[in-house]
């Protein structure tokens, strides 16, 4: 195409971060054909756990390969405004879905005999998804309280993500949400 590679992107001009010794050091070749420099040391540019993300021993936390380190609960990827809009949207949609599914179920209760087999699974589907929307609404109301550990200024621990079943409310919320989502999906197939 006639384009020249830009000088700024020439790889030979860039410093290699994994370089273990200066480029001027003598290089020797071992029996396997790999090069080795004298006094070769490895620099570690990896992740280290900040003090406010450290957890006590025995909790089983592991974040980015570091033991006793928990992921932070505050947003890392989105602005606060974007999170507020997303949370508000989930809350509003969950209320709308809860109203729609409860309306369907209450319509069924008016005349139960009217809904025979082809229509009956829709009622079960509606009940399942009314509970799913209720779980989303409860999660919206609780905010980060179920998914995040509280910060402790005395221990210098920041707000971190809950691991596994350490928070019973988070576990119950997830289990009910998962069960009724799967049940609703199965009723949709039937």
Curated annotation (Swiss-Prot):
FZ domain location: 1-20
A single GO molecular function term of this UniProt record: G protein-coupled receptor activity
Pfam families xref list: Frizzled (PF01534)
Topology within the bilayer: Multi-pass membrane protein
Stretches in topological domain Cytoplasmic: 111-121
Transmembrane segments: 90-110, 122-142, 170-190
Subcellular location: Membrane; Cell membrane; Cell surface; Apical cell membrane
Glycosylation site positions: 144
GO biological-process terms attached to the record: nervous system development; Wnt signaling pathway
Keywords for this protein: Cell membrane, Cytoplasmic vesicle, Developmental protein, G-protein coupled receptor, Glycoprotein, Membrane, Neurogenesis, Receptor, Transducer, Transmembrane, Transmembrane helix, Wnt signaling pathway
Extracellular side: 1-89, 143-169
UniProt cross-references to Gene3D superfamilies, sorted A to Z: Rhodopsin 7-helix transmembrane proteins
GO cellular component, one term: apical plasma membrane
Keyword Methyltransferase: no
Domain notes: The FZ domain is involved in binding with Wnt ligands.
Family: Belongs to the G-protein coupled receptor Fz/Smo family.
Job description of the protein: Receptor for Wnt proteins. Most of frizzled receptors are coupled to the beta-catenin canonical signaling pathway, which leads to the activation of disheveled proteins, inhibition of GSK-3 kinase, nuclear accumulation of beta-catenin and activation of Wnt target genes. A second signaling pathway involving PKC and calcium fluxes has been seen for some family members, but it is not yet clear if it represents a distinct pathway or if it can be integrated in the canonical pathway, as PKC seems to be required for Wnt-mediated inactivation of GSK-3 kinase.
Record's protein name: Frizzled-6
């Amino acid at each position: 195409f006639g384009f020249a590679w830009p000088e700024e992107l020439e790889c030979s001009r860039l410093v290699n971060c994994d370089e273990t010794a200066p480029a001027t050091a003598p290089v020797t070749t071992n029996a396997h054909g790999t090069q080795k420099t004298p006094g070769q040391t490895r620099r570690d540019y990896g992740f280290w756990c900040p003090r406010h993300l450290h957890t006590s021993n025995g909790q089983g936390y592991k974040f980015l390969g570091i033991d006793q380190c928990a992921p932070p609960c505050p947003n890392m990827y989105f602005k606060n405004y974007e999170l507020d809009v997303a949370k508000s949207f989930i809350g509003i949609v969950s209320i709308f879905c809860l109203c729609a599914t409860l309306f369907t179920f209450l319509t069924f209760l008016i005349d139960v005999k009217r809904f025979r087999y082809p229509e009956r699974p829709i009622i079960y589907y509606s009940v399942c998804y009314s509970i799913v929307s209720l779980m989303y609404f409860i999660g919206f109301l609780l905010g980060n309280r179920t998914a995040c550990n509280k910060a402790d200024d005395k221990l210098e621990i920041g707000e971190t993500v809950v691991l596994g079943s350490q928070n019973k409310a988070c576990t119950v919320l997830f289990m009910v949400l998962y069960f009724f989502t799967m049940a609703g999906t199965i009723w949709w197939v039937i």
